[in-house]
A protein has these predicted regions:
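Extreme N-terminal starter segment of soluble prokaryotic enzymes
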Residues: 1-4
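Short polar catalytic/cofactor-binding loops
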Residues: 7-13
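Cys-nucleophile CN-hydrolase/nitrilase-fold catalytic domain and related Cys-dependent amidase chemistry
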Residues: 14, 22-103, 177-196
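CN hydrolase (nitrilase-like) catalytic-core segments centered on the catalytic cysteine
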Residues: 60-80, 144, 153-233
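Short beta-strand scaffold segments in enzyme catalytic cores
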Residues: 81-83, 96-99, 136-138, 201, ...
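Active-site catalytic loop in hydrolytic enzyme cores
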Residues: 88-165, 178-188, 192, 249-253
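Residue-level detector of high-confidence beta-strand sites
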Residues: 96, 109-112, 172, 227, ...
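C-terminal beta-strand edge segments of enzyme domains
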Residues: 206-277
Length: 277
């Protein structure tokens, strides 16, 4: 699979953001990408959550997601992107990561579970958290993906849940706000999630000034294969399933856990048979 990390700089203008998304997705398609990942809140973004997010929120069959579906279908690549989804609460929409396959079909919608209530920021003041249930991986481009959103990265149990379900690639769509040590934390956490789950971890964050940028792909051994600076940009990298299988064969840590957590559902994908307690 050829993966494109699309580091955009969304603003508080849905139409303008859609134009930027269309341009960068076209660039990813021209580079031969099978999947392009866009940031959290790619549809609409501000430095702080306010009532305007509820005003612009759309259902999953609304015009913004429909435009993403049309892009995917026309250009023949899968898209993962952050949208503001209307919820049952008229004042608090969901922060949702949609997954659209290369045929333009919506195959997944992950609603952010862990809202950002830290560093003086309150995402929950205007965003409704997703259901407290284990999300399922989505299949795009022949790989199993585990969608996550920003602050989710700090909760290893979500990544481990995805790994136990056979996920090959963790995808963290983010708006990682700047601050002391935040860039180092972002990079370290992505590398840690990749190493401890022997999978790829792609982090795609908004560009400056709202976010730090610094989108990257961490390999299962923690090596950073591609990265961006704080400016808008596109990075393309090839993912080799054979290399993933080799790393899992060398380090079968997912099969060697002993603290009562479930083992991978498909042992063959983890580099060996499932071991029962």
């Amino acid at each position: 699979m050829r993966l494109a990390l699309a580091q955009t700089a969304p603003v508080d203008d849905v139409a303008r953001n859609l134009t930027e998304v269309a341009d960068v997705v076209a660039g990813a398609a021209a580079a031969g990408a099978d999947l392009v990942v866009l940031p959290e809140y790619a549809m609409y973004s501000k430095k702080a959550i306010d009532p305007s997010f509820a005003l612009v929120a759309e259902p999953l069959d609304g015009p913004f997601v429909a435009a993403l579906e049309a892009l995917a279908r026309r250009l023949g690549l899968a898209i993962l992107a952050g949208v503001v989804e209307r919820s049952g609460d008229p004042h608090r929409p969901h922060n949702t990561i949609v997954s659209i396959d290369a045929d333009g079909v919506l195959v997944g919608a992950y609603r952010k579970i862990h809202l950002f209530e830290a560093y003086g920021y309150s995402e929950g003041s205007g965003i409704l958290e997703g259901p407290d249930v284990a999300p399922e991986p989505v299949v795009l481009g022949g790989l199993r993906l585990g969608p996550m959103a920003c602050y989710d990265l700090r909760f290893p149990e979500l990544a481990r849940h995805y790994a136990a379900a056979g996920t090959d690639l963790l995808v963290v769509a983010s708006s990682w706000v700047p601050g002391p040590h935040k860039a180092a934390q972002w990079r370290t956490l992505l590398q840690a999630r990749a190493i401890e789950n022997t999978c790829w971890a792609a982090g795609v964050s908004q560009a400056a000034p709202i976010s730090i940028g610094s989108s990257l792909l961490a390999a299962p051994d923690g090596a950073v294969h591609v990265s961006l600076d704080e400016s808008p940009g596109l990075a393309v990298v090839d993912l080799d399933p054979a290399a993933l299988a080799q790393e899992r064969a060398k380090d079968p840590n997912l099969r060697l856990r002993r603290l009562g957590t479930p083992h991978p559902a498909d042992g063959a994908r983890m580099g060996g048979p499932t071991v029962d307690h």
